[in-house]
Regions:
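Conserved proline-anchored active-site loop of SAM-dependent methyltransferases
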Residues: 22, 72, 141
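Short, hydrophobic/glycine-enriched beta-strand segments
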Residues: 16-22
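C-terminal capping/extension of enzyme domains
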Residues: 1-16, 37-38, 83-98, 121-168
Length: 168
């Protein structure tokens, strides 16, 4: 069934990095915000690498991101998908990142997982390169489906996000 992205991107004029997922999971679509599946490790990984308590409410999550210069969105604005599996995504329509790039100071784009990176490479690479001068960086997915990566390994891999936020 065709799904359209239900959320607006989270960013402001102080956002320095953009983290792109592939498309909201079924629990996220149901609960109305990014990475809402409690099994997804996104919020815990970010909190760990940034030495902060994990945000819990939607308002806390937005404040957490914006206070640290982080923008989030997804690489696909529309797709055919059953459930939450990236492997079952077809008929992908890429997101328009221009409003984020024109409204923020994004210096690096990170793809949360293989499917997000694939969409970036196939559809969004030129837009990302024009805006940042850098290729999108693939990070291991925080999804519970990525069982190959335990929490500690995710934290190690995602530390580059904290490094660029700190060092600029």
């Amino acid at each position: 069934m065709s799904q359209t992205h239900p959320f607006k991107p989270i960013f402001d004029e102080n956002s320095k990095i953009l983290i792109l997922g592939s498309f909201p999971s079924a629990p996220s679509r149901k609960l109305g915000f990014y990475y809402a599946n409690p099994q997804n490790r996104f919020w815990r990984v970010l909190a760990q690498i940034l030495n902060a308590p994990p945000p819990t409410s939607t308002d806390e999550k937005i404040k957490f991101l914006l206070a640290r210069g982080i923008a989030i969105y997804d690489a696909a604005i529309c797709c055919e998908i059953k459930g939450s599996s990236d492997a079952k995504m077809t008929a992908v329509v890429p997101a328009n990142l221009e409003p984020i790039f024109s409204g923020a100071r994004i210096v690096q784009v990170y793809a949360n997982g293989g499917k997000a990176h694939e969409i970036c490479e196939k559809y969004l690479k030129t837009q990302i390169l024009n805006a940042t001068g850098k290729e999108p960086v693939k990070l291991p997915s925080t999804s519970p489906a990525n069982a190959n990566f335990g929490f500690e390994r995710l934290v190690r891999e995602w530390t580059i996000v904290a490094d660029i936020l700190r060092d600029g």
